[in-house]
C-alpha cells in the first residue's frame, strides 16, 4: 500500500514538477521530492499544492442541486407510500434524497418490514412524478447556468454525479437546457452502491483521471454530502428543502444558500 501511495505521489511530481518548482523554489521542491523517493509512505496529503493547479473538475449532483425536482420526489414518495397502505411524513421522506440501492431497500425494510412492496411502490412513484413534471416542467435552480458558464469559461470540467438513472438524467438535463454543460454523467446505475456510499464519486474521479482531493463536489442533501466526503472530494453544499445538521456541515468545505453565492466564492479560490 505504501509503495502504491508513493508511486502516485511521484507521478504527481512528474506531471506538476515545473509548477511546484516555480511556486516553492528549487530547494524546497528537491527536498520534498527526495523524501518521497526514499519514503514510500509519503502521500499526496503531505505535498504542498499550488492553488488551482489541477483543480479543474467539478462534480454536480442533479436533483435539488441543479434542478428543482426534490420537492416533487418528496410529495410523490408520500403519495406512493400512502397508495399502498403505509404512512410516512414529509420529514421522514427527506431521508430518501439521493439514497441509492441497497440503502433504500434497507430503509423500507427497517421501517415497514420485509413484506413492503417496494418495487411496485417505486414504479407508481415514478409514474406520478413523470405526470407532475410533464405538467409543470423542470425549473433550473437559481444561479445554475451562471456557475456552469463561469466554470466553462475557466476550462473547468463539469460532470454529473447523480442517484437518478441515466435515461431520466439525460432527459431532465435536456428539459432544463443544461445538457451541453457536462462532459460526462455518472449515475448510480453504474456502480454497486449508490449514495451515501462513495462509489459514484470514486468512479467519477476515475473517469476524470483525478485524485478525489483535486475534485470539487456540489451537493444539496446529507446523503450526497456523505458520499462525496467519503470519496475524499472537496465538498460544497447548497441545502434544499431543509438545513443540514452539524455533522453534515462538518463534512463540507462550505455551505452556501445558492449556486450564485457559491460562484462568488469560487471566483476567490479557483
Summary of predicted features, one role per range:
Residues 32-54:
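Short, Lys/Arg-enriched N-terminal segments with co-localized hydrophobic residues
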Residues 87, 157, 234:
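Residue-level detector of anion-binding/catalytic polar loops
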